[in-house]
Design a protein with these regions (language model features):
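Short, extreme N-terminal segment that most often corresponds to the first beta-strand
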Residues: 1-34
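Short, surface-exposed, charged amphipathic helix/loop patches that serve as local interaction elements
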Residues: 23-156
């Protein structure tokens, strides 16, 4: 899976990759403030969604935290359950936002884009790492560019 992001101007980039048919594909895209804000709001949105779901079920954050009293005045709190629950919601929100951005930027959903980029040509064990690297690089470009913030979009 060979690809490259190339900066054209302040907010315009292009994704260049060799597709599964060994043809070079170039897709130009523009980053916007709205996209950067969506990326920056992933954790907050995920936590809100998590709290909404917990509330629907009648569960509070404290219900997920295990309190241990050793009987000698020492109390410890195990937040593992809460942290895992929160992590799940953050990963879910990241996947949703990433797919929305890929559809908006490249006109394809994430599965179709990666299939076209030849994800099947790399060992299955390496695929999650490749997806993570691509996602991280795209996220960096959208939020910070290669060296600056987006100027396109609603400046309010």
């Amino acid at each position: 899976m060979k690809y490259e992001f190339i900066k054209i101007d302040l907010d315009t980039y292009k994704l260049v990759y060799t597709n599964k048919d060994k043809k070079e594909v170039s897709i130009e895209f523009k980053r916007t403030i709205e996209m950067a804000e969506k990326l920056q709001g992933i954790v907050a949105t995920a936590r809100l969604n998590m709290y909404k779901e917990l509330s629907k079920q009648g569960i509070t954050k404290n219900d997920l935290i295990i309190k241990k009293d050793d009987g000698k005045g020492h109390i410890t709190y195990d937040e593992t359950n809460y942290q895992e629950y929160e992590k799940f919601y953050i990963q879910l929100e990241e996947a949703i936002i990433l797919n929305e951005m890929i559809e908006k930027l490249f006109g394809k959903n994430i599965k179709d884009l990666f299939d076209d980029m030849g994800i099947d040509n790399i060992p299955e064990a390496e695929q999650p790492m490749q997806l993570q690297l691509f996602s991280s690089k795209l996220g960096q470009i959208i939020s910070k560019g290669l060296d600056d913030t987006p100027s396109e979009g609603n400046k309010e």
